[in-house]
Amino acid sequence: MGGAISKKQYKRGGNLRERLLQARGETYGRLWEGLEEGYSQSLGASGKGLSSLSCEPQKYSEGQYMNTPWRNPATERAKLGYRQQNMDDVDDEDDDLIGVSVHPRVPLRAMTYKLAIDMSHFIKEKGGLEGIYYNERRHRILDMYLEKEEGIIPDWQNYTSGPGIRYPMHYGWLWKLVPVDVSDEAQEDETHCLVHPAQTYQWDDPWGEVLAWKFDPELAYSYKAFIKYPEEFGSKSGLSEEEVKRRLTARGLLKMADKKETS
């Protein structure tokens, strides 16, 4: 019952990179070289043209931003709420882009160090996240993809808060986020503005940076998020509460957290 649909969904769900590219935009460094063949085909298949993209700035809401230390669920109830929010926030168009089964194909399990490494290399071999612009929507698509296809509970994908390189806070995940310079021509040219995702992605980031995923195998044996920014791990960092607050304040993160609480 429903076998044909399930098989079709599984086949479509196999190309995560295509799903992410369909969500919006293109990889950096290719604006002047032309769109990738796979992306062009995906646009044609979906029946959507570049005119659907907009230069209007997307309003940033810190309460929705994923890459902050206060976004990491601390309790089982918070985890359930986080997962439900991920599901509620992704609309019908996202479901079509992801193309995965409605229910997890395997039993749910927590992300582990070994599993994170395995998934990082698996995604890289399948085309990877390399160079794909990061935004909140693609963050949720990746969460949902790994939850439905691999049964991984979506409470693991957190990155350091920036500015600058955002390191994964889950040890073993080998994809970091790096700031990408957008050329002045792309910033100012109205035509390019319509097709270049960097024109809107910078509004998703509190520091105004455009971010892209980058594979870093060194993250398998160097916990850079903890080494560089232990304060973002709170009480787990081993730092005193006063030192944690001092470091977060110096980086402007406590101010962001306070603004979130009052908004």
From Swiss-Prot:
Pfam family, one: F-protein
Lipid attachment points (N-myristoyl glycine): 2
Subcellular location as annotated: Host cell membrane
Keyword list, A-Z: Host cell membrane, Host membrane, Host-virus interaction, Lipoprotein, Membrane, Myristate, Viral immunoevasion, Virulence
Sequence intervals crossing the membrane: none
GO annotations of cellular component type: host cell plasma membrane; membrane
Region (Acidic): 88-96
GO MF entry, a single one: GTP binding
Domain of life: Viruses
Chain segments carrying region Mediates dimerization: 140-156
SUPFAM superfamilies: Regulatory factor Nef (SSF55671)
Membrane topology: Lipid-anchor
Keyword Membrane among UniProt keywords: yes
Domain notes: The N-terminal domain is composed of the N-myristoyl glycine and of a cluster of positively charged amino acids. It is required for inner plasma membrane targeting of Nef.
General function of this protein: Seems to play a role in optimizing the host cell environment for viral replication without causing cell death by apoptosis. Enhances virus infectivity and pathogenicity. Probably involved in viral immune evasion mechanisms. In infected CD4(+) T-lymphocytes, down-regulates cell surface expression of CD4, CD28, CD3, and MHC-I or MHC-II molecules.
Quaternary structure note: Homodimer. Interacts with host CD247/TCRZ; this interaction induces down-regulation of cell surface TCR/CD3 complexes.
Record-stated family: Belongs to the lentivirus primate group Nef protein family.
Protein name from the UniProt record: Protein Nef
Organism: Simian immunodeficiency virus (isolate F236/smH4) (SIV-sm)
Gene: nef
